[in-house]
Curated annotation (Swiss-Prot):
EC number: 3.6.5.n1
Start and end residues of each tr-type G domain: 7-189
Organism field: Methylobacterium sp. (strain 4-46)
Gene: lepA
Protein name: Elongation factor 4
Top-level taxonomic group: Bacteria
Intracellular or extracellular location(s): Cell inner membrane
Amino acid sequence: MTAKPIDTIRNFSIVAHIDHGKSTLADRLIQLTGALSAREMTEQVLDSMDIERERGITIKAQTVRLDYKAQDGREYVLNLMDTPGHVDFTYEVSRSLAACEGSLLVVDASQGVEAQTLANVYQAIDANHEIVPVLNKIDLPAAEPDRVKEQIEEVIGIDASEAVPISAKTGLNIEAVLEAIVAKLPPPKGDCEAPLKALLVDSWYDVYLGVVVLVRIVDGVLRKGMTIRMMGADAVYGVDRVGVFRPKMQDVAELGPGEVGFLTASIKEVADTRVGDTITEDRRPTDQALPGFKPVQPVVFCGLFPVDAAEFENLRAAMGKLRLNDASFSYEMETSAALGFGFRCGFLGLLHLEIIQERLEREFNLDLISTAPSVVYRLNMADGTMRELHNPADMPDVMKIDTIEEPWIRATILTPDDYLGGVLKLCQDRRGAQIDLNYVGKRAMVVYDLPLNEVVFDFYDRLKSISKGYASFDYHISDYREGDLVKMSILVNAEPVDALSMLVHRTRAESRGRAMCEKLKDLIPRHLFQIPVQAAIGGKIIARETIRALSKDVTAKCYGGDISRKRKLLDKQKEGKKRMRQFGKVEIPQEAFIAALKMDS
């Protein structure tokens, strides 16, 4: 199979908010073009991980090549790139979009434009995409196609008069989508005589083939047996096989400009292939790499520890396996006095953290405790150096630190008007600064700058409960700003508990500390001596609760007689308790940790 004429190729992606039906539309397109037989079809063909199907989200970018004979009688090759829709994976989305020339914008005709639709559409517009609006779910009784068309024009500012009305579930009007792709989206540009230049869109690990790399050829031709160079990672490989996905893998002789396919080159680790890198031929390299490549930086960190210390080796093996498939996930070993051996892991965001944790528990059936998530702080030291702080327990002496900077995000929230007050109050409470507020039809669009530290805990859940689930939320990291942050330690019986220390804003320290102490007071079982539970900033105690001692009734065997006899026994007991408090160790049960850490999240 040789390279196709470039004017018959269409590369497109589907942009939509979670649950607006983009994976179902992809299924229908695959079915209609006959890429899979009816027997092989499953729901959400392109969401290959169970967790993707269950949560109804797409995590890894996938691709499929469809052959379509259009009404003008020509054979077209359509390459569909299925992109992740969630905020945490925006970089993967931007790379997938860079590999296409156009997008289908899928909007639920009953719900209208949501925050993530906006974020992804703006990315598509930045990538100079031609955009074809598609109204999905028009078979629902609640569908209001005309109102949604107006909304698309008003909010996004693209012409929606020719939006294609479809129902992906019933398969209504799907042919019109294919015709619109062929007619409205531009063919790719590229020169097949030029040196090879290809964009690395995504990669994953296959047990038999090693790393499979998804590529979009920009110039030149990729053939089997070529020696290729990854420009960002500066590594050289020999190509073993070249092919395309029709969702099943199919080998081809070569891939020409504008085509999307895969290559395998006995690469051992996904970490060697960085999303967004440029692939070129080693013998005849291209002059400049493709723009927009940046190494992935983890944003949220948290400690993962096995509940049973004997499981540590299994956890290490499981992490290694996940890392093979997900290069944006990083980890290193750490030990904690309270929780034993575990790992400090870096993630792209909260959803990513949840997914990794769930995959560890489900695919490798491990029981895990996760410590409170924290973000990466920058410490400007007094001697003029800068350090990054991933774990609050590693905070150096306060006297050596000049200033602390924390990451801020720019958040866009779309909410029905009725809940606007609650949403604004939530953002205000989280130290947010309002940037913009305007109305889109009956919904308010609020733009806020917020510290990421305040968002990692329970911001998303709170937002959903305030707005009864109607608000949608999208963010990107904007910059680092100086903040008045302090390290709060929790002391139990005057001993600091490392797993519970955290960095908080000075204004929030007291309330957070008090809540934590009250929680621990209920969770730690009573001992034979009194236990103080304290929250401290440096040497200053800001909150305290006391766990009462269990006391034995030592005067029970005295009846009548002199008071001094009872006194003596009580004093003797008091002496013993005092000594006990000095040498006694407080056992904090595992459940107490899990519950205390849950309070924060």
